[in-house]
Amino acid sequence: MSQQNILAASVSALSLDESTVHTGGASSKKSRRPHRAYHNFSSGTVPTLGNSPYTTPQLNQQDGFQQPQAFTPKQFGGFNNGSGSVMSTPVMVSQERFGASEASSPYGQSMLDMTAPQPTSHIVPTQRFEDQAQYLQRSFETCRDSVPPLPTTQFYCVDQGSCDPHLMSLSMYNIPESEHLRAATKLPLGLTIQPFSTLTPNDAEVPTIPLPMDGTPLRCRRCRAYANPKFQFTYDSSVICNICRVKMQVPGEHFAPMGPNGQRSDLNEKSELLHGTVDFLVPSIYNAIQEKELLPLHYVFLIDVSLLANENGSSLAMVEGVRSCIEYISDFQPNCEVAIIVYDNKLRFFNLRPDLDNAQEYIVSELDDVFLPFYNGLFVKPGNSMKIINDTLIKISGYISTDKYSHVPQVCYGSALQAAKLALDTVTGGQGGKIICSLNSLPTIGNGNLSLKRDNAHIAHVKCDNGFYKKLASDFLKSYISLDLYVTNAGFIDMATVGHPVEMTSGILKYYPHFQQETDAFTLVNDMVTNVSNIVGYQALLKVRCSTGLSVEQYYCDSSDNTDHDPIIPVLTRDTTLDVLLKYDSKIKTGTDVHFQTALLYTDIDGVRKVRSINTSGAVSNNIREIFKFINQNPVMRIMIKDVIKTLGDCDFVKIRRLIDDKMVEILTQYRGLVSSNSSTQLILPDSIKTLPAYMLAFEKSELMKPNAQSTRGNERIYDLLKYDSLNSAQLCYKLYPQIVPFHVLLEETDLTFYDANDKLLQINSSSINNLSVRASHSNFINGGCYLIFQGDTIYLWFNENTNRMLLQDLLSVDESLPVSQISLFSGTLPETGTSINQKASNVIKNWQQVVNKSSLPLVLLRPNVDQYYSNVMSQLLCEDKTVNRIESYDNYLVIMHKKIQEKLQKDDFIKVSTAATHENIHQKFVQF
């Protein structure tokens, strides 16, 4: 049989067969495993276990929970159902109102019954459209729905006492009762936490709980969990903690009498007992530095004005970015203070005191032992000193543009960072702040200078091995300082070393190779303003608490060294995302609920100390079929990728790819052997993780994982590595598998238009999904087509010389006679032409901006035989194609996996489930915040 026939036979039968549950034979041997909720790729095999009966648990009812009022998104056309309630489901702007009989309460179904996710396609773009379609006419209700929508799906959420999954989500919503059962899935048990994710609608605010009379929130005296909707209050003035199940007396200041319905009489006044996510105001005992008064966030802007930065225009772009950021801070963060320092082979400080007539510059040439030439006027509130700030920026621009004979090629990057830290420590008393820095070339002078070298592949690993930058990063962390770095040159700068403080302090690194002022300046300025606008707080400490039986194995965070130590996050943004791996301490009782609480202690940008409490739960199960059914793919994928990244070692990427493939085969073999054993001739993908192979294959083809025989620490590889620490879930999904939307196909009138009045839900008719679902493969591109392609931070517009010129005229407002090679975009944005196709394209771009939480996204032309970067970009975008280093195409990858799965099944080489094996009980450790 030909390869094509094999491929067709193997791939065409993709399905999810849940009609039969396999019950394998008993194991002949049992052995103890470490209490770990997920095995590294280097771990050994897991012991084979026997059979177990299957039951389907339901979430248990918690006393003291009151249903919240029905939810209507802002501007939605909700209607009265005759009893005063309002539909919680979004109503399309143009649709007719339903009849009264259809307006029943959205809570008619018991909140205890978890709703299984609907089956979707195994093709990534199709799955995204299908998933979005499911949430056009309904909201996600946190006590009824279980597995959340895809990260790329926009949806409205009703907080019914469990958090919005944007903020925290589980990898499994039916949690295995034991480590043995979890091991049988070969999947990680963990959490993905994005504490300040943008909620829908945008004005959905997290409630703030004021300080009670005694000055402390209600907390469990044993495990220190914060009060939440699953706290059980009793008639004897006690409360039972849902985390550790300990009963304690309710303090007098938190007491309220119980009503006949078993609920507190003041329940409607207690947001912390109604909502899954709240902010507690906390007293000074919670301060990062007890004896210090809290301060608003302080910014230091560091501008590289060396010769190369001035020649390519990146220094001028940085000056404009600083101006835009300070204007934003003045308008939206008025209590924050800013400082400006520029550097080349010297440090230049600027006095920004509002009572000055002109900008004052102080030059420091002592780089080995940096000092501050002045104190008063180093930091100012922008609103008070905007005149002097503008004068300072004009003076810097004049130096860059006209004083060219004074420009030098050296940069004292390390000394500049030390100066910024010294400034923050001196003014804030060690309370931290944000450093925003540009860098254009390898640091060669001052502290932290690096010898001129090239990436010669002699160093196999990708970790920082420079003592100065490792110590500097550690010092930043202790002082709650975070660094954002903007690199504006393609030359080798040892990014693994100079970017280490960024990685350690949860900062952001942006890379603009071959920087050109005409095309990249706009993007740089927008990136800077977006990153500043995303900042929500600083001085953060995070802790996850779990019900007895589970605990944290590790936080995937460099500040905690990827251990179970509570991670420090110097500066928080809306995109700050943390993945957590859990472990079993003991077996958990089937039919009960497991509760999870993330407590994030932080100071907001205005200097107010708070704790954000985020709560969710899952049901305990011993049914392997139900466990697979309620898998949440996004945390699974993120944890698998983080586990690879944190164990790169000597970067043998061939071996690492093989281990990833083996892990995928093991997962699918377990599903096939335990759940869908009857479909012997079919390739079976569990519906809950149907696209996981596509994403993991795309990860194998990423810039990070490319062959390293010639280059191990190049800028592109390290930049790709650092991205995985800073991307939120939606950005990561688009980065791994770009979304491609064709505009040359026939579209319905309502296709690619917004369904709701808030312009959040992009709709596509079911009849158009196939036409609009373009797989990331060269064979799916049509000569003469026109496509928008999005890969997380950049949108590409693909067309060629055969594209319909009338289409381009309607889309871009370009003359039909203008050659394709001469078409350009002003400031990297889509022009407004007033045509239907232009409006649809604008809607798509707006939707992507909302999903990834960006105020703007650059639009870049991508034309074959025109743009020099075309081949390189296309090789990154087309993740389903076979690569030059012989990583298989997606279809062939599935065929190869199918063969390996069949071989393992024939050998009976998979773990069989059993409830006979037990672990000794290890009580959850006492945790203190």
From Swiss-Prot:
The modification Phosphoserine is found at S15, S83, S85, S94, S101, S110. Residues 18-28, 40-52 have a biased composition (Polar residues). The keyword Endoplasmic reticulum applies. The modification Phosphothreonine is found at T72, T216. Its main location: cytoplasm. It is found in: Cytoplasm; Golgi apparatus membrane; Endoplasmic reticulum membrane. Residues 220-244 are annotated as: Zinc finger-like. GO terms for cellular component: cell periphery; COPII vesicle coat; endoplasmic reticulum; endoplasmic reticulum exit site; endoplasmic reticulum membrane; Golgi membrane; mating projection tip. Present with 12200 molecules/cell in log phase SD medium. PANTHER family: SEC24-RELATED PROTEIN, SECRETORY 24CD, ISOFORM C. This is SED5-binding protein 3. It comes from Saccharomyces cerevisiae (strain ATCC 204508 / S288c).
